[in-house]
Amino acid sequence: MVDGLSFNLGYSELETSSAEDGASDNNDQHEGTFNLNYAIGAVSIGAQKSVVNASGTSETKYDSEYFGISYAVSDNLSVSYNNIESNKNVDGTDVDQDFDSISLSYTVGGMTIGVLDAEADNASYSAGRTQSARSVQMTVAF
């Protein structure tokens, strides 16, 4: 194995059924994912792929790719960028969602201050819907 390299693989299966008023509805879900992460010095890079197939009253498939990179500027300051591209297919109709974020984190003693700027195109898999968010947070450890 290469120093700083990690790889994960996962699969899950959820089988559910419910009968209400004599009707039967199967809502099975199958999910597979894998990721690859590499850290060298002050830089960490990660990528992930996941696929979710769900059945029920309609066939739904989510196909997502994740990418992130972070850089530790110093022991106290780090910056990171993340991107998620996801496709939702319901009974043959596709919608692509794209999410980008950049964050900055500064730690001193037991206190961390973080700043995040994020934007999603086709947010919540709604074509033409754009959402953006900015946040500042402070965490204190005692």
Predicted regions and their residues:
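Outer-membrane beta-barrel proteins
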Residues: 1-142
